[in-house]
Regions:
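C-terminal transmembrane-helix exit sites in multi-pass transporters
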Residues: 106-123
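The feature identifies polytopic integral membrane transport proteins across all domains of life
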Residues: 92-99
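Hydrophobic transmembrane alpha-helices of multi-pass small-molecule transport proteins
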Residues: 124-140
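Membrane-interface interhelical linkers
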Residues: 1-13, 27-32, 37-71, 81-90, ...
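Residue-level signature of the transmembrane alpha-helical core
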Residues: 9-13, 40, 71-75, 99, ...
Length: 143
């Protein structure tokens, strides 16, 4: 049960930190240099996680277990990084951009979850989707 709550808490706080730091990245810095430093630090942090999640069967064995998803995740992460750096440089507000992208991405993933992962959707879920759509309209309403 600890992992259930810890994992979502980590994701929430990391996402908030991510958007805060992306918005705080100087607008005059080169995107590539910024992300190069980001990924170098991330590499070190990931290496440190071996303390908590040690390799049990050897690195070669673990590498053989990987599939296309690791490459896809890398491409997605770079797209997210560049996308948000550009979004914030273009003048989007922190709260609006984060909510908009997460809600729209979630809406895109609903059919993916249903058709590729055979997840079920209830009427309550459908109502939640409609609330999300209403929220998007309200977020982008001209003031």
């Amino acid at each position: 049960m600890f992992l259930f709550y810890f994992s979502i808490t980590l994701a929430i706080f990391s996402s908030a930190l991510y958007h805060f730091t992306a918005k705080s990245t100087p607008s005059n810095v080169n995107f590539t240099v910024s992300l190069l430093v980001t990924y170098a630090v991330a590499f070190v942090v990931v290496l440190l996680t071996f303390i908590f999640f040690p390799i049990k069967n050897g690195l070669a064995f673990e590498l053989k277990q990987l599939n296309w998803a690791s490459i896809g995740l890398a491409i997605a992460v770079v797209g997210i990084e560049f996308g948000f750096l550009l979004t914030y440089r273009a003048g989007w507000h922190l709260g609006i951009a984060a909510v908009l992208t997460n809600v729209v991405a979630s809406l895109i993933l609903v059919p993916v979850a249903i058709f590729f992962f055979k997840e079920k959707i209830s009427w309550v879920n459908i109502l939640g989707i409609l609330v999300c759509l209403a929220g998007l309209v309200m977020l982008n309403w001209k003031r």
